[in-house]
């Protein structure tokens, strides 16, 4: 498998990266990070559940799909440390992952549409597809770490809240969506690393174009006769001898 070809591994990693970024978007916007369930013993009243997200908060009665209270300014007054950290970490992870997707796309497009012989005028602008995929893999790994760590911490912080107050806090499915998306980012990075390691025997340097040697004036010179480069000593001059 050569680095000059677009393989299923790079295409699959790109699609996996898109799905993971979409999952991070969903996890960031979902108002289902933590539930606070308030149980009443009055038969004339219903139990109340408060759904807490990173940006909004919603309170519902049991059996109702409408929010009794919908706080759109919750993100300004978040009083839970793990959610405050997630407000910063998840958008940062999305930005890093989108940059990795852009690098991955540049590498694939350069591999698919670039000619085998580069233009001498564009020699300084040539891109190493393998280098793009390697850096993209590192960025995907970084994005997964940035999003996974605070998401797991939110689970343990939930236990801290139950010990500090009452056992009424539970984490909701947005935590699982984010953890699964972070796992997808790690899988994307792994696919790109495997692809790079499979073709690392290529002799091109890390960030040089994917050719056996860097293109230059001596490599792509205008065609002319090879004998014109020979010196007078190297040119074979026929000698005519007269027999006596």
UniProtKB/Swiss-Prot annotation:
Residues 32-87, 157-174 are extracellular. The chain crosses the membrane at residues 11-31, 88-108, 136-156, 175-195. Keywords: Cell junction, Cell membrane, Membrane, Phosphoprotein, Tight junction, Transmembrane, Transmembrane helix. The keyword Cell membrane applies. Its main location: other. GO terms for cellular component: bicellular tight junction; cell periphery; lateral plasma membrane; tight junction. GO terms for molecular function: identical protein binding. Residues 1-10, 109-135, 196-244 are cytoplasmic. It comes from the Eukaryota. Gene3D superfamilies: 1.20.140.150. It is a multi-pass membrane protein. The modification Phosphoserine is found at residues 228, 231. GO terms for biological process: calcium-independent cell-cell adhesion via plasma membrane cell-adhesion molecules. Belongs to the claudin family. Interacts with OCLN. Plays a major role in tight junction-specific obliteration of the intercellular space, through calcium-independent cell-adhesion activity. This is Claudin-12.
